[in-house]
Structure formats: C-alpha cells, structure tokens
C-alpha cells in the first residue's frame, strides 16, 4: 500500500529532511513538513508563549497540540514529556474554554546520549549496563540510576 500524502515533523539534521523529501518527490508522494506556529486553532486553541515562537521545535509544539487536544475534556494544565535523543518537559497551562498556553519547558540529554558522553568522557567507565537502585552500591548501577533520575 502506497501513501497518498505524508505529513512529517523533524528536528533532525537538514540532510535527513532533504533525503526524505527527495524520496517522496521521486515516488510522486505529496508531502508537507509541519512547522511550529504562533497558535493552533482546532477543537481547542493552543497559544505559543515562546519569546520567538519559530525557535520552538516542531516536535515539541505538535506533541503539545496533541496532548492538549487529547486532554481537552479534563480541563487541566499539563506536562508533556518526551524521552529520546533529548528529554523535554514542557508546561501547558489550561486557561479557560478550551484555551491553552504553551509556557515553555526544559531540555536535557536523553538516556542514550548521557551514557555515550559518560563512556567517552570517562574512559574507565566500561561497563554501564547497570540497573536502577534507590541506593546503588556499584558504579554501573550508580550511573544507570543517575541517568534515569536525570530524566525525571
């Protein structure tokens, strides 16, 4: 089954988007890369309160749009958390009558990057396949516990 249209979102290196775009064009597939907006209007409204709305990654913006829409019936403020290459935690403030504000958030290294940087930066750390422990008693468990704790 061949897609008729692709709607994508990427914050990867431009070469990734270029390669995908070329593939779509070569196969006659219509495509559109979505970008962050100053506001979203649908079943609910989400206002982008970033100093420069265009600097907010489209991945974070559309995760916020999806979360606000999915939780619309709850009428509550939200935290939207992504864990991948980076871990992001974003605050979505519920105002009234289906209106939300994207207030901003935090970005840190994701678990894989943390582990990679630790092994490259501290050559003596060779075995990092530890487990989470409330009070680790081995270096590998201490590293894994620290990485997991840093995500929350």
Which residues make up each language-model segment?
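Nucleotide/phosphate-binding catalytic cleft detector across ATP-hydrolyzing
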Residues: 1-79, 97-152
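Short beta-strand scaffold segments in enzyme catalytic cores
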Residues: 78, 87-93
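Active-site glycine-centered loops adjacent to acidic/histidine catalytic or metal-binding residues
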Residues: 84
């Amino acid at each position: 089954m061949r897609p008729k249209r692709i709607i994508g979102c990427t914050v990867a290196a431009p070469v990734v988007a270029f390669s995908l775009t070329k593939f779509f064009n070569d196969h006659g597939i219509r495509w559109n890369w979505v970008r962050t907006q100053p506001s979203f209007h649908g079943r609910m409204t989400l206002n982008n309160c970033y100093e420069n709305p265009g600097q907010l990654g489209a991945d974070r913006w559309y995760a916020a749009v999806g979360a606000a829409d999915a939780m619309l019936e709850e009428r509550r403020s939200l935290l939207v958390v992504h864990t991948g290459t980076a871990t992001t935690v974003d605050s979505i403030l519920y105002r009234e009558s289906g209106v939300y504000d994207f207030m901003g958030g935090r970005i840190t290294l994701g678990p894989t990057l943390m582990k990679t940087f630790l092994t490259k930066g501290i050559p003596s750390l060779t075995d990092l396949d530890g487990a989470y422990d409330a009070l680790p008693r081995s270096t590998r468990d201490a590293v894994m516990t620290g990485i997991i704790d840093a995500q929350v």
